[in-house]
A protein has these predicted regions:
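Detector for outer-membrane/organellar transmembrane beta-barrel domains
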Residues: 2-3, 7-159
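C-terminal transmembrane beta-barrel domains of outer membrane proteins
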Residues: 161-163
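Active-site pocket scaffolds in enzymes
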Residues: 167
Length: 171
């Protein structure tokens, strides 16, 4: 028997830490006209307006493994197909303190996105993101910890080849 998941906010709960048994499968799409713009060519400065089109398919599982110990499995995976216009890529660098954050034109020899932790984060192409976590046995005071690993695979049209990234964390 599966528990019902609250649908109040789409971004509120990432794990129930074994308190619920939840399986959700979702799909969504979004389209909006004239969201991005690009030049027709390097020599033609007139702009082409692009319609943003996004599609996503995801699955979420939060499954108690041993209720007495408080252990649980947490799994989330999503696949996005995004179209922001021809060759659109957006680089982000959260709390990037690198002096060369303005890009490779000013700092040849750095990564495609520039210095520091800048990386292509979204753009026209596909993104697959997966997170797997395991809730460890509860401590005597009732505290729970969930170490997790994530993997992100991105393939943006402008870059041409795909890239992958692993991350580790603790809830």
């Amino acid at each position: 028997v599966w528990d019902k998941e609250s649908n109040v906010l789409p971004f509120f709960v990432g794990s129930y830490l074994g308190a619920k048994k939840v399986l959700n499968v979702g799909a969504g799409w979004y389209a909006h006209k004239d969201v991005t713009a690009n030049r027709k060519s390097a020599t033609d400065t007139s702009l082409v307006l692009n319609t943003q089109k996004n599609f996503g398919l995801d699955v979420f599982l939060d499954m108690p493994m041993n209720k007495a110990k408080g252990t649980a499995l947490n799994f989330y995976s999503v696949y996005y197909i995004n179209d922001y216009g021809k060759n659109y890529v957006r680089n982000l660098g959260i709390l990037n303190q690198h002096a060369a954050a303005e890009g490779i034109s000013a700092n040849p020899g750095t990564s495609w996105a520039g210095g520091g932790n800048l990386q292509p984060t979204l753009g026209t192409g596909n993104i697959w993101y997966t997170q797997v976590g395991y809730v460890l046995p509860k401590l005597k005071n009732g505290t729970s910890f969930m170490p997790y690993v994530t993997f992100t695979q991105k393939k943006f049209d402008r870059i041409g080849k795909s890239s992958g990234q692993f991350d580790l964390g603790m809830n």
